[in-house]
Amino acid sequence: MNELNTVSTNSSDSTKDGGTSNSPDDMDSAAAASHAIKKRTKASRACDQCRKKKIKCDYKDEKGVCSNCQRNGDRCSFDRVPLKRGPSKGYTRSTSHPRTNEIQDHNNSRSYNTFDNSNNTLNNNTGNSGDNGINSNTVPSTPSRSNSVLLPPLTQYIPQAGGIPPSFQNPAIQSTMPAGNIGQQQFWKVPYHEFQHQRKGSIDSLQSDISVRTLNPNEQLSYNTVQQSPITNKHTNDSGNANGSVTGSGSASGSGGYWSFIRTSGLLAPTDDHNGEQTRRSSSIPSLLRNTSNSLLLGGQPQLPPPQQQSQPQAHQQKLQQGQNLYSYSQFSQQQPYNPSISSFGQFAANGFHSRQGSVASEAMSPSAPAMFTSTSTNPVNVAQQTQRPQGQQVPQFSSELDGNKRRQSAPVSVTLSTDRLNGNENNNGEINNNNGSNNSGSSKDTSQHSQESVTTPVALEASSPGSTPQRSTKKRRKSYVSKKTKPKRDSSISITSKDSAHPMTTSSTIAYGQISDVDLIDTYYEFIHVGFPIIPLNKTTLTSDLLLVNTQPISNIHEVNSYVILWFRNSLELLVRVALKQKPGGKFFDNIVGVALSPSNDNNKAGFTTATARDDAEKTRRDSHNEVQDTLEVQSVFIAALNECFQKIVDIHPKFRENNDQISPKIKVIYLSTFILLNYILAFVGYDNSFVLGMSVTIFNEFKLYKLLLFPEPDINDVKPPVDEEVSTGNGNTKTSEFEIGSESAGHMNPSNSPNSMDENISHYSVLFKRLYVLLSVFDSLQSCAFGGPKLLNISIQGSTERFFSNDLGSKWCLEQSQLRLKSVLQSLKLGELMSELTRNRISMNGNRKPGFDITNSSSLLSEYVETQPLSVAQLFCKLLIGKHNFINCLLSLYDSEAGVYSDLTLDLSSKIADSLCSLISIILQVLTLILRLNPTNSIDFNYRPPNPPANNPTVQEGPSAMGSSPVAGNLSAAPPSEGNPDFYKKLLGLKQDTGTILSDLCRGIISPFAIAILHEVYNITELVKQMPTSLISIMMTATTTQNTQDTKKSQDLVMKLSNSMNEVVQITSVLTMIKPFKIFEHELNKPIMSLTGGLSSTTRNDVMWPKSGQGLRESSVMKTLLDERRTSGTQPTTAPVAAEEPRLENVALENFVSIGWKLLDDSELGWY
């Protein structure tokens, strides 16, 4: 008793001195301070920078900075919380600190009284609830700590609504919580066996135990509050694991086996009974109760969120509603804060496809079933997500060990990004709403005796909010309950493997997906990408309300395929958006890259993961220690690894499509094939040559027999009179035999009754989508052939397919775009692809012995219908440029007669013809560049530079070009805030006029295009070849003026004036080319020489032909000229060779240069633009 009085006296003294704590440690420090009144002159510990570098710190108060920080220009900070010191060896609590033990017992008794009172109150609430089920707050009293098995932590059952602690729970909120499901058990069933090698609880460690510790208001533990689907719970099959292993169910898939495409229906929301279910032993819960039939969506209708959402703070509600639109997105829905672990793409994030999943029966009956409380996931995707947390929140102070099989079930999270974050600005204030609750939950008692290799999360990131005490987990504390800690291996593909897994883990995700929410992805795509080129050939309403309504319930053997396909479609779309986002200077398209060591001396990231603070410090170190070339190579390697990962994952599932072709829904097939279009779009967008992706895509499309839909007659969607929801069937209930089943070997039909996942849908309603997808792949095939000069892989003509398959009725369910104005821009980009397809199919080098210009003339006449009087988009202007280029090539090559070996006479009419073609070509080039400069010079997604929203389905805009410039459109454009200080000034500077074409072209403002880099390369090539021609023609005109009459002199003067204007335009083109930077990831040098890979030609031929510098190589023989000469000499007419070898006359030197330029332009068309 005297000792207790002494303690009280010391405590009061320490309080007077400014102390705020009555803990024994503070008492000892206060007693020691009384004996040593002398103030310290040196820091009692090293500053954070010196401790990080593990060097001696000489910090003093009078200087305020240590010598090391002063030398590096840093400031000394002591923000890091000191770690608790562990006991020394041979330490005995009973003999060493008897007084401290008594105080600890006293505090523990007070804690027990607090928990007993709270438990009694909760038990009374349970008795009042009656048959309504177990409330999530009804927690059994703390068991005897000596020989009992620890139940899941108490914080697991406490609702985490905005981080409200148990003591601040509002009784009114609890009264509004829905009752539990009928038939659930009301009482706990304690596990009948103990887990061996599990640390027993003790009274002394009670307050440090997370399972009985109260929550701080500023601390929110992200526990998984949703019951894990049994399909996503994999079990270990090791025979030696007799007692089972305590593992977590940290998957982010839906609780009812459905994707979170449902807008958090009441049954899928984490109600109180789901919280109670989460903590029960799976062996004591029947499978029907753990996955009730009520979780099925009846009709796929979205339901209201749970009433608990009303209890959230007002500020938190506003943040959640910023990016949340009222869409009936089936899977691409914004996750509610109560349901973070219902993320729609979590099951197959980085673990590949597994045909074997845990069955419902085996999980309910297995005595070694895992505990149903969650633990920390070790998936690098989730670990990277843990680094971003809102202010006022802290991560748990523990890291749980996982079994190898459970680690494969971790999932990416869905994080709603603010506008600044999406623009590439680092969000240092923590404005990101982290909607994942399954990543950081777990139990500090989670161990496994059979774990051979285990990975823990990095040291927790301290919170930066004012008023909260930052805390960190200690390595020594973790070692006390972690069986074995091993640093994971990092290989070239950045993977983490588990030796104890029943199935080896596949390569981990290269970048952390889930940083952009599902709703934001779809909105961003249709706002910035779809108008430039339709990757998903469907309007937004049908995509979100019909196509993405995919059932992943375990009612068939293809639910894994559905989940897997949609996951990697979503990840590929996020990869495109993140690459296309406008980045800040020095920023990267990836933020949470996993597994890359940021600094050789960085010891804080031993597991290979990065945190937000570590990234900030390491970014500065990287800029100081790495040059620009190394940073570029790093970004390129990460991008290639991420692209290859998405491509490999989506290809791996193809055998399952072949096996279950009759059962897979057409919706999944459309999404699956759209993923290949998406990956080819990414390659074209960054200008990267990867023919393997295109070749495999063509193979997959041919496996689905999509070419039959284009080759064989079938009624178009415009000709289908019945509604789309009706089935056009024959008498036996099957579809028409004239329609081909996608993926079958021949024409056939589908029986809806044999396809439980097809939702009784007739595949004929999706045939137009498959046709569109095939046309889109053919466009990318043509683009790659034009850009890199390779042969075309798809030789089926798509001429006229734009009008047949894409420009259907706007009121149709399957229309491409619901706005007529936006649809016109989409169709123009498709016509550009159609034109490139026809040009590559009719190449001279690919079509035997044909005269140069024969196919060019035919193509120009056939495709002239694409050119309108007022071009509205870059794609349409580029179509006009390509046709003008081929006409110009034909005009130049006609100056020389290869049969007779003579040049034509350069008359005034011929000179006028050449000048008109040249001036027209240069004028179109300037229009293309100025329009690109005004609309999107960087070809990036900038949320501060959004495209205007035209009125949807306005009948006044469908009549003609004059009606399109009506007042509604002009009013909408004028209402949009201008991003430039004076738009009219810049338009006048660029030579643009305020006419109908200019107004309509603004609809493409901010839109990205896959043709941007290819267009810039081609424009540069043409400009470099023809920029000296106006000067040559002017010289010829001035020379010929002396021998002409008055009328011809007036005509020649007009030509000279026109050519002078063209020279001025060439200067403008040269300056504008330096202002357009559409390059992403890979830097393209427009004037970089490319070595010829043609076997029979010299390596220097291609250099001078394609990129002549300062007039070099104007007389060099072109590749196509050499090829055609060889074909002509190998024929049966060798008599023309001596005539062609005659020395040209001096007066024909200019004509010879013009013909040489024509051949080089032909080389550019035949051998590629890059």
Swiss-Prot record:
<feature type="compositionally biased region" description="Polar residues">
    <location>
        <begin position="445"/>
        <end position="457"/>
    </location>
</feature>
<keyword id="KW-0678">Repressor</keyword>
<feature type="region of interest" description="Disordered">
    <location>
        <begin position="944"/>
        <end position="977"/>
    </location>
</feature>
<keyword id="KW-0010">Activator</keyword>
<feature type="region of interest" description="Disordered">
    <location>
        <begin position="293"/>
        <end position="323"/>
    </location>
</feature>
<feature type="compositionally biased region" description="Low complexity">
    <location>
        <begin position="239"/>
        <end position="250"/>
    </location>
</feature>
<dbReference type="InterPro" id="IPR001138">
    <property type="entry name" value="Zn2Cys6_DnaBD"/>
</dbReference>
<protein>
    <recommendedName>
        <fullName>Glucose transport transcription regulator RGT1</fullName>
    </recommendedName>
</protein>
<dbReference type="GO" id="GO:0005737">
    <property type="term" value="C:cytoplasm"/>
</dbReference>
<comment type="similarity">
    <text>Belongs to the EDS1/RGT1 family.</text>
</comment>
<feature type="compositionally biased region" description="Low complexity">
    <location>
        <begin position="385"/>
        <end position="397"/>
    </location>
</feature>
<feature type="region of interest" description="Disordered">
    <location>
        <begin position="77"/>
        <end position="149"/>
    </location>
</feature>
<keyword id="KW-0238">DNA-binding</keyword>
<feature type="modified residue" description="Phosphoserine">
    <location>
        <position position="205"/>
    </location>
</feature>
<feature type="DNA-binding region" description="Zn(2)-C6 fungal-type">
    <location>
        <begin position="47"/>
        <end position="76"/>
    </location>
</feature>
<feature type="compositionally biased region" description="Basic residues">
    <location>
        <begin position="473"/>
        <end position="488"/>
    </location>
</feature>
<feature type="modified residue" description="Phosphoserine">
    <location>
        <position position="1130"/>
    </location>
</feature>
<keyword id="KW-0804">Transcription</keyword>
<feature type="compositionally biased region" description="Polar residues">
    <location>
        <begin position="1"/>
        <end position="22"/>
    </location>
</feature>
<keyword id="KW-0597">Phosphoprotein</keyword>
<dbReference type="InterPro" id="IPR036864">
    <property type="entry name" value="Zn2-C6_fun-type_DNA-bd_sf"/>
</dbReference>
<feature type="modified residue" description="Phosphoserine">
    <location>
        <position position="284"/>
    </location>
</feature>
<keyword id="KW-0805">Transcription regulation</keyword>
<dbReference type="GO" id="GO:0008270">
    <property type="term" value="F:zinc ion binding"/>
</dbReference>
<dbReference type="GO" id="GO:0000981">
    <property type="term" value="F:DNA-binding transcription factor activity, RNA polymerase II-specific"/>
</dbReference>
<feature type="modified residue" description="Phosphoserine">
    <location>
        <position position="202"/>
    </location>
</feature>
<feature type="modified residue" description="Phosphoserine">
    <location>
        <position position="208"/>
    </location>
</feature>
<feature type="compositionally biased region" description="Polar residues">
    <location>
        <begin position="139"/>
        <end position="149"/>
    </location>
</feature>
<feature type="compositionally biased region" description="Basic and acidic residues">
    <location>
        <begin position="99"/>
        <end position="108"/>
    </location>
</feature>
<feature type="compositionally biased region" description="Low complexity">
    <location>
        <begin position="424"/>
        <end position="444"/>
    </location>
</feature>
<feature type="compositionally biased region" description="Polar residues">
    <location>
        <begin position="411"/>
        <end position="422"/>
    </location>
</feature>
<feature type="modified residue" description="Phosphoserine">
    <location>
        <position position="410"/>
    </location>
</feature>
<feature type="region of interest" description="Disordered">
    <location>
        <begin position="269"/>
        <end position="288"/>
    </location>
</feature>
<comment type="function">
    <text>Glucose-responsive transcription factor that regulates expression of several glucose transporter (HXT) genes in response to glucose. In the absence of glucose, it functions as a transcriptional repressor, whereas high concentrations of glucose cause it to function as a transcriptional activator. In cells growing on low levels of glucose, has a neutral role, neither repressing nor activating transcription. Binds the consensus binding site sequence 5'-CGGANNA-3', of which multiple copies are present in all HXT promoters regulated by RGT1.</text>
</comment>
<keyword id="KW-0963">Cytoplasm</keyword>
<dbReference type="GO" id="GO:0003677">
    <property type="term" value="F:DNA binding"/>
</dbReference>
<feature type="modified residue" description="Phosphoserine">
    <location>
        <position position="283"/>
    </location>
</feature>
<dbReference type="InterPro" id="IPR050797">
    <property type="entry name" value="Carb_Metab_Trans_Reg"/>
</dbReference>
<feature type="compositionally biased region" description="Basic and acidic residues">
    <location>
        <begin position="271"/>
        <end position="280"/>
    </location>
</feature>
<feature type="compositionally biased region" description="Low complexity">
    <location>
        <begin position="309"/>
        <end position="323"/>
    </location>
</feature>
<feature type="region of interest" description="Disordered">
    <location>
        <begin position="226"/>
        <end position="254"/>
    </location>
</feature>
<keyword id="KW-0862">Zinc</keyword>
